[in-house]
Curated annotation (Swiss-Prot):
GO terms for molecular function: GTP binding; GTPase activity; guanosine tetraphosphate binding; translation release factor activity, codon nonspecific; translation release factor activity, codon specific. GO terms for cellular component: cytosol. It is found in: Cytoplasm. This is Peptide chain release factor 3. One of its GO terms (biological process) is regulation of translational termination. Gene3D superfamilies: P-loop containing nucleotide triphosphate hydrolases, Peptide chain release factor 3, domain III. PANTHER family: PEPTIDE CHAIN RELEASE FACTOR RF3. Its main location: cytoplasm. GTP binds at residues 18-25, 86-90, 140-143. Transmembrane segments: none annotated. Belongs to the TRAFAC class translation factor GTPase superfamily. Classic translation factor GTPase family. PrfC subfamily.
């Protein structure tokens, strides 16, 4: 067996998705704790304390206690290499989250036991559906009062349209929480509150009939549990690996991330059943992970991960072959070989140089402006990975400068932040305005904050009469030129040089489409098929 085949089989690359405040970042920490990657978990709640959550590393995130950039963390567990991608928890950062989901092979959905399925969870589930991503579910905050577990399973099935297969089942909830029972092994894991900051294994009974269990949880609770389990095992589906891998069934676990409870059964099950790196579609063929030659795509660019060095790092998912430190790779978009020196692996913002990487791994490439989101690297073959889109923004603002002498820094900052996916940046053909587009209001706050902190630019954003944007394309260059002349006041170029129609109203957009039937108007732009505009 080749090294690439063996190492690919060891990899598990996944993302954690949830509605804000479902406890995703806390669970991330506990997974790292069990993987031995960190010794002590930092409570996300202690926002003003010395210890902040390991995966919330940007200053703004530490101040607000929310994740607004995606972190990448790698740790070993039970002979496997786990690549965990933490996604932005705030609703405004959907696009960044979507691109993270293009780089993983499976996902873990976190649901708050008291709130059930929330709006953000529904949207993220739709994204996972597009690629049939296998999903496991962790119902969190079991140490608090919440919805009836049977009702929760019904809600997940009804709202998200995916079959539930419970793997662990709660014994009580809130103040009455006594533990969980594993429905596949019959093991009972007892809940011991207060042991939440260091790695711990709960007391385990081998079955519901084990001596001493009734004394620990109470005769009545044990009797109620037997009754409930009969009901749930009769009414719910059994775990089916094929259905799970096809994205049609989700194994469900219950626990409390903040108390470190129920996390280890989840991690053990994940390592055993989650898919290793899968094949990937490109514009020309399917790439298998076990191929010997390196391929990979960039799904994220992060500026200024190290404020002392003002650097930019491109996050590349390795799709096939083996990456070795300092190797040259073919950058398909520019048709040039680039030396991938000093590539990094991550523990959030802690970085280490990487000697080699295999399919499923995410590496950081130092980027001086030549690499963009969606770029493909190979060992010479011309191909581009598909399924890495940009979405048309819903909110627009004009950037205004307090100090006109800082225009150059503002343009540089906006260009870099748009390449990173923090915002979209448009330059109208007929004016010198700098227009920003976003999917949520928080993005403008983040951009203003980062412009000031990282580029020394004080900028304000004022409303502008734009309702939506569409990327425009036409096979016939003469027709496209005529369209440009007639609609020049509504046209702009984005940070990649693509032509974009900025519509003041939906009616205006509809009229423009009716008047130019040969022009294609796109609400998303696929990076693999990006078309340059002069």
């Amino acid at each position: 067996m080749s090294e690439v085949v063996a190492e690919t089989a060891r990899r598990r690359t996944f993302a954690i998705i949830s509605h804000p405040d479902a406890g995703k970042t806390t669970l991330t920490e506990k997974l790292l704790l069990f993987g031995g990657a960190i010794q002590m978990a930092g409570s996300v709640k202690s926002r003003k304390a010395v210890r902040h959550a390991t995966s919330d590393w940007m200053t703004l995130e530490k101040e607000r206690g929310i994740s607004v950039t995606s972190s990448v963390m790698q740790f070993p567990y039970e002979g496997k290499i786990i690549n965990l991608l933490d996604t932005p928890g705030h609703a405004d950062f959907g696009e960044d989250t979507y691109r993270v989901l293009t780089a993983v092979d499976s996902a873990l959905m976190v649901i708050d036991v008291a709130k059930g399925v929330e709006e953000r969870t529904i949207k993220l589930m739709e994204v996972c559906r597009l690629r049939d991503t296998p999903i496991m579910t962790f119902i969190n905050k079991l140490d608090r009062e919440g919805k009836n577990p049977i009702e929760l399973l019904d809600e997940v099935e009804r709202v998200l349209g995916i079959q539930c297969a419970p793997v662990t089942w709660p014994i009580g909830m809130g103040k009455r929480l006594r533990g969980v029972v594993n429905l596949l092994t019959n093991e009972v894991h007892l809940y011991e509150p207060g042991r939440n900051f260091t790695r711990q294994d709960s007391t385990i009974f081998t079955s519901l009939e084990a001596p001493g269990l009734a004394e620990r949880i109470g005769e009545q609770m044990l009797a109620d549990l037997h009754e409930e389990l009969e009901l749930i095992q009769g009414a719910s589906a059994c775990f089916d690996p094929t259905e799970y891998l096809g994205g049609r069934q989700t194994p469900v676990f219950f626990g409390s991330g903040v108390n470190n409870f129920g996390v280890q059964p989840l991690l053990d099950f994940f390592v055993e059943h989650a898919p290793s790196p899968q094949q990937r579609d490109t514009t020309s063929r399917v790439v298998l992970p076990t191929e010997e030659k390196l391929t990979g795509f960039v799904f994220k660019i992060q500026a200024n991960m190290d404020p002392q060095h003002r650097d930019r790092v491109a996050f590349m998912r390795v799709c096939s072959g083996r990456f070795t430190a300092g190797m040259k790779a073919f950058h398909v978009r520019s048709s040039k070989d680039l030396k991938l020196a000093n590539a990094l692996t991550f523990m959030a913002s802690d970085r280490e140089s990487v000697a080699e990487a295999f399919p499923g791994d995410v590496i950081g490439i130092h980027n001086h402006g030549r690499v963009s989101i969606g770029d493909t690297f190979t060992e010479g073959e011309v191909l581009s990975f598909t399924g890495i889109p940009s979405f048309a923004p819903e909110l627009f603002r004009r950037a205004c400068l307090g100090d006109p002498l800082k225009l150059k820094q503002l343009q540089k900052g906006l260009t870099q932040l748009s390449e990173e996916g923090a915002t979209q940046f448009f330059r109208p053909l007929m004016s010198n305005d700098l227009i920003l587009g976003a999917v949520g209001m928080l993005q403008f706050d983040v951009v203003a904050y980062r412009l000031k902190n990282e580029y020394g630019v004080d900028a304000t954003f004022e409303p502008v009469s734009i309702t939506t944007a569409r990327w425009v394309y036409c096979d016939n260059s003469k027709t496209l030129e005529e369209f440009r002349e007639k609609n020049v006041t509504n046209l702009a170029v984005d940070a990649s040089g693509e032509l974009v129609y900025l519509a003041p109203t939906r009616v205006n957009l509809q009229l423009a489409q009716e008047r130019a039937p040969e022009i294609h108007f796109f609400a998303t732009r696929e990076h693999a098929y990006a078309v340059g505009v002069d």
